[in-house]
Amino acid sequence: MRQFKTESKKLLDLMINSIYTNKEIFLRELISNASDAVDKLNFKSLQDSSVKLDQGDLAIRVSFDKDARTITISDNGIGMTAEELERNLGTIAHSGSEEFKTENAEQQGSDVDIIGQFGVGFYSAFMVASHVKVVSRAYGEDAAHVWESDGLEGYTIEDGERAEHGTDVILTLRENEKLDAEGEAETYDRFLTEWGLKSLIQQYSNYVRYPIQMMVSKSRQKPKPEDAGDDYKPEYEDYQELETINSMTPIWKKRSSDVEKKDYDEFYKSTFHDFDDPARTISFHAEGTLEYDALLFVPGRAPFDLYSKDYEKGLSLYSSNVLIMEKCDDLLPDYYNFVRGVVDSADVTLNISRETLQQNRQLKAIAKRVEKKITADLEDMRDNDREAYEKFFENFGRGLKYGIYSSYGMKADELADLLLFWSAKEQKMITLAEYAKGMPEDQKAIYYAAGDSRERLAKMPVVKGVIDRGYDVLLLTQDVDEFTFQAMREYVAADMPKIYEDDAAREAAEKAVADGAEPEVEDRHLELKNVATGDLDLATDDEKKEAEDATKENEDLFSAMKEALGDKVEKVAVSARLTDAPACITTEGPLSLEMEKVLQKGPEGAPDGMPKSQRVLELNAKHPVFAKLVAAQKAGDADKIKQYSGLLYDQALLVEGILPEDPVAFAAAVCDLM
């Protein structure tokens, strides 16, 4: 019995129990080792003309014996001598593949794809096996050797027999564990089924470059006997056939010009279990200090759980065609969590188990490039296939908005131009850039209204007042919309026609254009303004003076109405924004009525201490109701002022989509007036 090199027992125990968290990856590791062995022989044949190989014969085979509880992984690669068995398997964390890559770094090309790095993958076999036997015959050698170990005390190396060069790794699986206190147990029998092994091969090693073959069970109809009568019923028999389990050539490594759309669509649907074709396919290859391939998909519809806390984002990460992580969330920002796809790079730094990535600049560089590619593709769809983009935005636009809000506006530069909102004027979805292009020259802000439906918002007096002045209003109907705009604070509209300070400058610019010069443009910083919040400063000087005069003349009335309404409002004032409606509720400060409603709709309602919107009851001094209020004040009719104040406040709330605090009292007051 030979002892493992290094602190073998402790290190091997650490390997089995700590480094790997998922026992099923043992097959991935052993298949990767087999692939490396075949690659080494392939490389040898390229360097040495005396080594004759038929490329079609290079393969890896996986088999199992349920009764003997064994799994065998075989290859016809370069094999190992007794000394190499001692060095590679007797020394934990010595990587023959890494040594090979180092020694032949300058000579390797695209024909060689060595996977191993750390020299520990082989020992993952002991997570599932109580005994491991390795039979290997090195290429060009007559003798074979057998390495055996139970993973505890040590190992033996003896002479053996093998018909040709290559290696067999034979695992004797552990017995199933008994149920623990939590009712859980490891069932190793799951690895002793055809379906179980095929599933693991296709999940982790589907794109290993050499065929991975298995004998699989099939059924076929027996030949019909010549003397069979009319009542003959077909008979079937089971048989076994050698089948290649893996796809070998990953579709993401092919040039996109060589792949048809239907092939991308089929790969997407089968890999990501979707019934619909993807809306967009993005394929690219990056070269330089960091080389990788990426194949990304924008789904045609949102998964049902996209906005649930259980949804997991991430791209499948491969290294040299071997699956490392099924969902690497570091490769996607949260606002692109809907994107599915694959990134494959031999250059990323893995941890020793290859189950996870080490956080490093390489990963960040890939993620940054992936994000840029997604953004560019979405911009292309927005500009060249608007119908498809609007459908995409209906599915995934909420996440883009949340990306701006959750970053406190830091991502606005990247995402703002991808957003769509309903235009009250154009009666369609438009971008912020399109809104800006359609603004009158004197407009200095982007106006919006927020609520639960476009139909209700379009009828609001404050919206109608802005539209009547010739300005468009964006109608925001998702909960996150106004929070997004508050995080942005402003939108920088690029390439806007330059506004000149005086007529002389304007005339000079117009003359230059007439003489063939390009029109001057500028970036314009546009504030995002809620039409129901604060002072929009849209009134003319005459309208402002009328409002000021009405306010001064009726200070006692407004004081009486404020007293009647109590802390429901901050103040009562004359409005310069209303045209037809008798009253409206606006707010001062950062919290609008709609934002207050959204916060109150949380799972536990409005949190204690949450600030309330600072409501202002604005009155239309030109409306007949205002004249009645003035008359009541002059007559000293405090009861009528109180009744009118409550009615106007409650009806203004209804216009905002908010029920009165006391609907019964509101209905009674209306009936009383009737």
Report the location of each language-model feature.
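GHKL (Bergerat-fold) ATPase N-terminal catalytic module, capturing the glycine-rich phosphate-binding loop
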Residues: 1-187, 191, 199, 222, ...
